[in-house]
Amino acid sequence: MEQTKTPVFDAAKAFVVPILSGGEKRCEVRFPSDEEWYAWARAQRTVRHFLGRGKPQSEDVDLPKINAELFAKIRTDKDGPEFDDAEAGMVIGRIERCAVASVEREGINYRIGMKVPGARVTHVLRMPTAKEMQDHERASTSVVAARRSVETRAFLEPSGALYDKLHVSHDGYAGAVPIVHKSAAVSEVIGYLAIEGDDDPE
């Protein structure tokens, strides 16, 4: 009896991404390199404006343009249907997606199951120390305050570095783990640990 092979995530293969926008549209893209994901994240900034009377308003500056630029780099079917900036953003969101399916504590480790494009993958990371989490938080964001606004930028590189420190094992990949998957796994562990740490002392 022939065994069914479990799909694995392969960043080297092409991805056909369908979206719904006035009907179904499809395009073929390659998965961005870590360097492209780094640049994409660094280019984004969120500005929080303070309008008075305690009414802040947040704005993601140039995000449609940033998504469209990455989409143009990774699209491989150049003769396919035209995608506007909003549709390009939908495609980037689809290939970036890491949906966490499960988190299990195993002693001092966490086993994270995730659904990623075309596969289900698993990461086992050890529990970070308080200092590792503190250093990661400081390095992951840049906050610049002005008179009536605050600008925030986020960086992926610190999540990659922390993932490599915490890494015990991973499964479901044909090659290296992409930075966006590392970042999602690290965020999930930190978030889960924060929930566990909220228990009142006895």
Enumerate the language-model features and the residues they cover.
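Short, surface-exposed, charged amphipathic helix/loop patches that serve as local interaction elements
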Residues: 2-5, 12, 21, 25, ...
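The feature marks the first
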Residues: 17-18
